[in-house]
């Protein structure tokens, strides 16, 4: 008698809809589902996929990073599209005129973009303006920017590991003995 095929790993794990029950997000999903199906543009498919993503996979994009990315050659007069939040950066003094589209824009970032003569679109306005994503630049925030990523990687204490250990506090008595001081065994 043959062994039956194992079906336990058959399922493809990817989101087919957003986890959130936010009705406005669901409406955007409806709109971009239609656009992704009816247009042959990859832009709409990428936006749809990103609308499904979790909060940690939609990290906020700072104003400074957006300005830096939009200054690159060939990106003049294009719309910056962010499936996520745009936040303010106080380190930036001059904000150029920008045209942006995002799910959310923090209040200070909003006032600074508009003060510079820029324009802020929502995704439904973007769908009317460029249904195929023409004249847009898709941007996203740094996914590995969260503090938790510092704890990932090679175990702390092993050679060439720069992983942050989970320590109660950073005092003299905490993870400062063997392997950290030459007087206590060895130091690496």
UniProtKB/Swiss-Prot annotation:
Linked residues for Glycyl lysine isopeptide (Lys-Gly) (interchain with G-Cter in SUMO2): 119, 164
Q: Which residues carry this modification: Phosphothreonine?
A: 158
Q: Does the keyword Cytoplasm apply?
A: yes
The record's SUPFAM superfamilies line, in alphabetical order, gives:
Ribosomal proteins L15p and L18e
What positions are modified (Phosphoserine)?
A: 130
Q: Write out the biased-composition intervals (Basic residues).
A: 161-171, 178-188
InterPro entries noted in UniProt: Ribosomal_eL18, Ribosomal_eL18/eL18-A/B/_CS, Ribosomal_uL15/eL18, Ribosomal_uL15/eL18_sf
- Compartments, record wording: Cytoplasm, Cytosol; Cytoplasm; Rough endoplasmic reticulum
Please give the name of this protein.
Answer: Large ribosomal subunit protein eL18
Source species? Rattus norvegicus (Rat)
